[in-house]
């Protein structure tokens, strides 16, 4: 993304390692926190907010690439660990210190790039500071971008004819919760899936051997057959009661991250 003819940069810093990301979108900011005072009864006064401090909130959206995919999934694995976000918006250069993962979304549409959204939250020692002379400006280096193939989704050893979109979400609160939504053309031959899916496999990149395995998927809603001659597009949401496994397996790397 360019602002005033210059590229913005977005970099994650964790354990003294820098991970430049392709700048797609980010809303990381400081938000006011406090309490509200109600207006006086009988008068048309607006509710007033008494500010007691600032909190860091927002999200980062980036494309999935070979240079960042493992680092992003390791952030989910160590969801309680803290990291920094370095943002160069041309007019301002800020560092959001000691934030952690609040939730995430991985989404893909058929023949389109895979996108990863990371929502952040602040901690007791979180703060915002400006770049100093020692802060490195690391431009993103273009590499292989991963594209989603809607014909490569496997449910219980059976390849589904088409899942044209999916959304995998996770929330890290007192109890970690994962859900996935599958979008597909309605077909009595392959759908609806009323029973739970024991294992769902989503290929992220066939060439480099990168995929996701999701275990013990329980449908959260029922499907209804529609007597229609035309194609009917629908979706079904599942709760992931088992684990989410991220895999990289090729000649140079054999890595597995279990969430």
Predicted regions and their residues:
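Signature of extracytoplasmic/envelope-associated structural regions
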Residues: 1-259
């Amino acid at each position: 993304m360019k602002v005033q003819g210059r590229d913005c940069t977005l970099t994650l810093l964790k354990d003294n390692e820098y991970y430049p990301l392709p700048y797609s979108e980010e809303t990381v900011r400081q938000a006011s926190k406090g309490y509200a005072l109600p207006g006086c009864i009988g008068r048309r006064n607006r509710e007033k907010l008494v500010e007691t401090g600032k909190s860091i909130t927002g999200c980062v959206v980036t494309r999935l690439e070979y240079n960042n995919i493992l680092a992003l999934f390791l952030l989910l694995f160590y969801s309680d660990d803290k990291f920094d976000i370095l943002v160069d918006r041309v007019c301002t250069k800020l560092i959001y210190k000691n934030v952690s993962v609040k939730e995430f979304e991985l989404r893909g549409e058929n023949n389109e790039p895979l996108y990863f959204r990371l929502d952040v939250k602040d901690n007791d020692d979180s703060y915002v500071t400006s770049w100093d002379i020692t802060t490195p400006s690391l431009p993103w280096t273009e590499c292989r971008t991963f594209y989603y193939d809607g014909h490569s989704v496997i449910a219980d050893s059976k390849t589904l004819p088409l899942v044209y979109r999916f959304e995998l979400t996770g929330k890290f609160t007192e109890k970690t919760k994962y859900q996935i939504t599958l979008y597909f053309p309605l077909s009595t031959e392959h759908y609806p899936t009323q029973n739970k899916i024991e294992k769902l496999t989503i290929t992220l990149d066939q060439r480099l051997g990168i995929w996701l395995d999701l275990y013990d998927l329980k449908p959260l809603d029922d499907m209804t057959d529609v007597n229609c001659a035309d194609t009917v597009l629908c979706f079904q949401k599942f709760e992931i009661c088992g684990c989410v496994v991220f895999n990289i397996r090729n000649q140079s790397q054999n890595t597995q991250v279990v969430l």
